[in-house]
From Swiss-Prot:
One of its GO terms (cellular component) is sperm principal piece. PROSITE patterns: MFS. This is Solute carrier family 22 member 14. The keyword Glycoprotein applies. Residues 1-21 are annotated as: Disordered. Riboflavin transporter localized at the inner mitochondrial membrane of the spermatozoa midpiece, which is required for male fertility. SLC22A14-mediated riboflavin transport is essential for spermatozoa energy generation and motility: riboflavin is the precursor of FMN and FAD, which are coenzymes of many enzymes in the TCA cycle (the citric acid cycle) in mitochondria. Required for sperm motility and normal sperm flagellar structure. It is found in: Mitochondrion inner membrane; Cell projection, Cilium, Flagellum membrane. It comes from Mus musculus (Mouse). It catalyses: riboflavin(in) = riboflavin(out). Pfam families: Sugar_tr.
Amino acid sequence: MKEDQNYKTAFGSQNSRDTHRHEISFPSQNWSLEMLLRRLKAIDARRDDKFASVMDAIGEFGTFQWRLVVLTFIPSILSTFFIFSHHFLLTAQRPYCNTSWILEVGPNLTEDEQLNLTLPRAPNGSFLTCLMYIPVPWDLDSIIHFGLNYTETCKFGWIYPFAHTRSLINEFDLVCGNEPNKENGLTVFLSGVLTGSLLFGFLSDKLGRYPIILLSLLGFLIFGFGTAFVSSFYQYLFFRFFVAQASVGYAICSVSLVMEWLVGEHRAQAVILQHSFLTIGVILLTGLAYKVVHWRLLCLLGGMPMFPLICNIWVLRESPRWLMVRGKVEEAKKVLCYAAEVNKKTIPLNLLNELQISGKKVAKASILDFCTNQHLFKVVLAIGCVWFTVSYISFTLNLKMNDFGLDVYFVQMVRSIVAVPARLCCIILLEYFGRKWALNLTLFLVTSMCLFLLFLPQEPKSTIILTLMLAEFSMAGTLSIFFIYTAELLPTVLRSTGLGMVSLAWVAGAISSVAIFKQTKTQLPIFFCCLCCVLALCFSSLVPETGSQSLRDSIEYNIRDSIEPKDRNKDVPMVIAEESMSDIVADSEVTNTTLNAVTFKPEENSLLNMTLEVPKMDLPVQSLKAQPP
């Protein structure tokens, strides 16, 4: 009896400890369960995706995929020379009126003597930049003895005696009332982004990814390299408009091509690395612009590598997913067999025959489907609102940083150095938290930094600059994550068109940021940043998680992919549990494990109360293989 009491006491204390331990670890078990369900959903989706099966046979990331990713990285690096070069081509110069008329009466005058005799001085003793003494028909001795008294604006142009570089400013004399309007230059660039995103996005879905990538590279070659030969500032703006079109066209089509060739987490890793190399390109551009003294030479150096790149572009292949949705199944088989040959793999014949079945129905879609398809409309509306807020925050932070008057080379270098690790950290975030939670985490960090900026004192400025850098660190990760998220949410048949449409929201956010920041110098723009962060968090919660699931090819969506979270709670867990867990429970190593019951609460109007019991598994998720039914 005493032993029974001791046993009951020990069992009771052990049960109490187990209950206490379970209560403490319940959140982590819920989080692990969520990760498990997400991975099982990806496994279930890949089991039904014939293209994913073919890619498994080819090799998920073999030599062909490496070559594809590298060939898309290189233009991303070079594109920075055309996108961000205006920061260094419009550096401020100190102009003085050209007074070479005095050399006719005093040809042996030095430059300092010439300026001293012909230019008026400011109260602080420096020469005035936009005024000169009126020329007089005197000899040199009379000018030195009596001096000149009457001034006028510069009549014979300007000189730049203290300029160390040759820029657009001193090339086209954009000084003394002829200064370029920065807002106009930004408007030209954003207009190019706007038209290019719509045009190239539409053409990419109609003609294919490969021809539009080739067209974008030709645009870099003609208008980027050709910028070095412009003869006026208006020609420069004209060329910059088409450079913006080529830039956004290449960004949309290259991401679509890479994501449609890769599967699983390789998609996210490739896009993040592409963005990281884009940032590395800015670092290279900054260092080169600091050393190269002539702006035309800088444009030539940035455009020359495009020539050999165009010659090697034939190595790329069209997206097989796009070929399949367009009904070009035989061409899709050819490019898949070519990829398998490069990877030294063999595709089973039965897998290729299965592609024939999916290719009999040609997916038909148009831009009107973004309005007529309810699910697609909700998704595009939500991600468009997030893109607007993200663009507004990004541009406002950049304008706030530029407002401190720091050296442009220092600012661009520090921004780029900060952005590279921020983007690389996103690989880990996406692996462990998924798209939605990783996006929410980075947006929360941006919100925190904006709140700090809102309440920080204006002095010392070093504290504000540090906070701005931390905010830009978080924003760099947000942009990469959400770009991947957006591309995965859109179907293959309208992926490029959808990316082009959400670019409208990005342009609208940029214009709003510039307009608000220009009108006020208070903390109002930062307050709007905080508000935009909250709105972005709200809208991002409306879109479904994509994780490592297979890309969608058509606009036909399942009910379980509804955008409403409450509907997902009803459908997704039950579907995944019924289809995937039945095979896992059958494993002999799992049948003896403890069961953890997780109950999903139904809505008030539900007819049945559903309870999902998920086995607690000691095996890693990667070792579980679902058997086909």
